[in-house]
Amino acid sequence: MESPVVEGNSGEVATPTLPQPPTPVSSNIRVVCRVRPLTELEKGRNEHSIVHFFDSKSISIRANGPQFTFDRIFGYQETQSQIFEDVAEPIVNDFLDGYHGTIIAYGQTASGKTFTMVGDPDSHGIIPRVIESIFVGISKMREKDTSLSLAFCLKISALELYNEKLYDLYDASKSNLNIREHKQNGIYVEGISEIVITSIEEAYNFLNISNNNRAIASTKMSAASSRSHSVLMIELSQQNLSMESSKISKLFLVDLAGSERAHKTGAEGDRMQEAKNINLSLSALGKVINALTCGANYVPYRDSKLTRVLQDSLGGNSKTSLIINCSPSNNNEHETITTLQFGTRAKTIKNQPKINKKITYHELELFIIKLAKDLEKSRKECEEITRSKNLEINNLLIQLENNQKMVVESNQKLELLNSQISSNHSFDNTFKEIENTCENSKIIFDDLNDHINNNNNVDENNNTNNNDNNNNDNNNNNQYQEESNQYQQENNQKDGDQNNSSFDSIKVEDLRDLDDEPDIEDIILNSTLGNISDDDDDDDDHHSNNNNVDDNNNGEINNDSDGYLNRSLKDIKIPEISDLNDHNINNNNNNNNNINNDNNSNSGGLRVSTSYITSSPNLSPSKSMDVNNSPPLFSYFKTKDFPPSSDENDKFFNDLIAKGENEQQQQQQQHNDDDEDIKSTTSNATTTTITTIDMNASHPSGIDDPIEFTIIKSDKTITSTIERETIQPSSLSNSTSLLDIETVESSTLPAPPPVTTTTTLTTVTTTKLTKTTNIPSNTNDINSIDDFGFSKIEEEGSSSNRKPNDTAILSFGDDDDEENEDNENEDVIVDSDEDTHSGKNNLLNTFKNDHHRGDFGATPTKSIFNKNGNITIKEFETPQQQQQQQQQQQQQQQQQQQQQQPLILQTTSTNPTIISIKSNKEPSPSSSTTTSIKKKNFNKRRSWIIFTIILTITLVSSSLLCLYLPEYKERLVQRRGYLNKLGIYSDYPTNEKISLAQHNQISLAKELYGGNSKQYYDEMSSFNTAYNHLIEMNHLETAVSKIFGSAIDLRFSGDDVINSIECKRAIHKLKTNNYVNGDLDQQQQQHNYITKIDQLSEQSKEQNQLIENFKLDLKNKTSEIEKLEKEIKQKDNKIKEKEEKIELIESRVLNEEKGGEKVLEDQIISLRNDKNTLSTQILNLEGDKKSLGVLVIKLNSDKTEIQNEVKELKRKVQELEDAPIALIPNPFVKWVKSFYVEKKSWFVENIYKIWNWFK
């Protein structure tokens, strides 16, 4: 098959061309002439031959007649085999290649047409030899087809044209048939019988039936004269299954009735009517020949049914050979000349033969793919071209922009130069004016000097005083200038220090009472790290200098200095003492090195407000938390125009610093006194360790700090010791160095450090604190917990309305149950860390900040709880503190009425802690939760049970289909039958292809038979049946492939997988089960096949040897025949010479005596006798040759049969080789098969149900 893609030598794909059918090649009709010998009847009428042969291509009537030239001329001696080899064999070869072919025998009555086409039993004509040659050619093509992809279908039909009516020679009941024309298939006869033949015997049987039905009658010129035109049509369909291509070729073998004259044939009645119709159709044939020869615009094919049938053979798509049969008798001279003239005209006709091959879908797909590749390639080339052009355009645009910029710059430079030139001109003018002014001033100065010198003696005292005043003024001006420059330098230096120094962000907490609003304000004080004392000294120096200036300078200078100072003092930002006292700043430190750490601990968990005392334009957080570089507690940076400080400012700052130090000392003294009290109390207590919880000090998520709880019990005192690790201040410097406004407002502060129990934040990593708390006898004193901010945990109402047993409950998750079980009978009471607000605020801020922020990851809550999860925290303060607490309680109760919602705390464990106030019992899971869990588990189990049932049903159905489906070969035979019916040549087409083929076949049948004919409905029903069966088989194969694909782990994907050989073999093996039962039988059968193949191969060798021997004998015989023919020709020449001599002698005999005539007659008789003997010898040799030819044909047929048997045996052996090795029979499989056989009817019924379910 021609491929639409052509590759050159370089491997590049050439430009694709649209796949076209083979182009026709113009060729003339081949015309040969055959002259029969004189018949016995003609010899009896003393008729003689008037035909003269010049060579193998020229002939003339009489010696001096015109010559007729043809492609080949056959004389009296040429045999049937020679005619076939020269005329018919090339047509048959082209017919096998896919061309249409036609062989026509034309001539007068009794000229030998039927003998040439049909022959007799002893000497076969062209038709039987053509059939034999076709089968031989098909067998050769099958031998060359190693892939077994070629399929052949040979159909044969016969018709006759009798009295201008078409009859079916095979089925005599079909008469008066109609001629149709198809766009692709050409001319065809509607309703004619087409018989598929598979062997030569079937073809011979068809020919015998057709010849018996032909119209034959006896006339004066022929005892068995054909009274009709007969046409034998042979159609060959060749299908290449691998390439999905097909070729359809037709061969027409035409035996025309002879033209005749009524007075010669003696036709009367019906014979006369037959002769008229014959002559009419032959005359129409002559008109067509003339029209084709002359190149007329219109060819009268429709004048006769004969020319209509032969339309493709004459000037159409066919390779045509015309045999003109002539009679040598002088009685038929006119008819012979007419026949020769007909042949001369016919050989000028040109046909357009071509291979009748259809363009396949595969070729079109390849062509489309090639076009798509070329399109993609051209698209990429266009993209590259456009990309390169765009780059060039972009480069040009960039160059243009650069040029424009250069032009603009050059214009600017020109303008600048022009402006400079103009300024130079103006400067020159100004300079000239100044020079003139100087010259004038010199003149005036000289005049003044002269005037002063003249009055020097008169104004001496005045000049002395004036000089003193001028000196003082100059000194004052110089001093003032120096001070101003120095002050400017110092201001510049301060500005640089402010830009380069770092500012601490001191977080001052507004420690309101516990009953205040939940929003707690923090004030950020930005302080400089500069030295205030040095600045003050510098300011004092400035003041002293200014005072000196005031004493020495005049009043204007003093006024200017005072104005400057007054203007600068307006920018001083000094907070009032009352404002600072309202913030209750408490740093809880012993020294100034831990200020930042103390601020961090106090601010943990509080929400920071956005109000600032002042702001700095340049903040450097890198050193803000550095302990060694910490500034004083309150320091205010100076603005850019900060003037020298006054005494009041110095006094204010000194008082403020002294007050902070005094407060620190008082707090330290208070703390030391508390420590002594605690130590004295712990000596009378007994210590019991409850439990130890190991936690990580670095605060990763989900892990707590290591805390050791120790309960010291006595009669009325409980001492709690809390040991935990603190965090180095240096580790907090980067995380809490400085907070900006946006961070504070969005409440996304960094995690504050853990709650610590230390009162002095030094670099020591572990500290211990113990405190003694007196337990009152009255349980109502538990209300003192409100001082720690736990009033939010309680229910509505004041502390007076609370019940004695109401406690705050911390509800923990399941993770804490195990720890609680170890402490079943112990209630732990946690006391406060410190006396000051620092420790209390830490715990309070933890609860409040978590509650207000809504997130629980910042500060882990450390609490001690009993077995029920109840936390009890008691605190007893001094009377002063209790009075403050009562005020706080009233405000907190008001807040409780507005905010009543459970508080959620987050511990470092995985489960959050919920504080409940309604009961002291641990919450238990609800019944609805348990029911939902059970439902989920039941749903899971139910889905698994359903899946198991479906899997079991699938496996059972697949095993049943395995046992009861028909074998693969049977289904393949059925499938191929249906596919051939629809004209499909692939074994596994898709459903779309099947539907399309059905539609095409039905439309073709409608065109052939008509929409209302019975044949059309029969064909349509058969097409529908084939379509339904094929669709059903496709569904079955798909279902089986899916089942077996899941069983044997093959990848099935519809028709593509089913078409694969591995899938076919797997399905075949699974369904036939040959590998279970047939191990020994297969081996024995395979051995028998091999031995039989060996025997047949030996027989074929012997047969080949016999054939070779016969061929050698045949060659020897033919050589002998050729020698005899040469001798006969020589003797014929001698006879001719002697005949000429006899004629001369006869002419002389008339003048000679009777005695001389007798002698000549005797010589003539002897010569004739010799000729007769030679002719008999020739006939004998020809008979031997025919018998040898028949024997050779028979041997060839035997050889082909043997070869077919060998192929069949090889195929079976190949199937046996492909079959898997037999497995060991399984007794379980035998039991299952016996069980299935017993329950066969039940299983068959279920199989049909399963099959319907699959459908």
Swiss-Prot record:
Keywords assigned: ATP-binding, Coiled coil, Cytoplasm, Cytoskeleton, Membrane, Microtubule, Motor protein, Nucleotide-binding, Nucleus, Transmembrane, Transmembrane helix, Transport
Annotated GO biological process: cytoskeleton-dependent intracellular transport; microtubule-based movement
GO cellular component: cytoplasm; kinesin complex; microtubule; nuclear membrane; perinuclear region of cytoplasm
Compositionally biased tracts (Acidic residues): 813-834
Spans through the membrane: 945-965
PROSITE patterns xref list: KINESIN_MOTOR_1, KINESIN_MOTOR_2
Expression induction: During the developmental stage with highest levels detectable between 12 and 16 hours of development.
Segments forming domain Kinesin motor: 28-349
Topology term for the membrane: Single-pass membrane protein
Annotated region (Disordered), positions in chain: 1-26, 454-503, 530-564, 579-628, 661-686, 795-864, 915-934
General function of this protein: Microtubule-associated force-producing protein that plays a role in organelle transport. Its motor activity is directed toward the microtubule's plus end. May be involved in cell motility or cell differentiation during prestalk formation.
Family to which the UniProt record says this protein belongs: Belongs to the TRAFAC class myosin-kinesin ATPase superfamily. Kinesin family.
Protein name (database record): Kinesin-related protein 7
The organism of origin for this protein: Dictyostelium discoideum (Social amoeba)
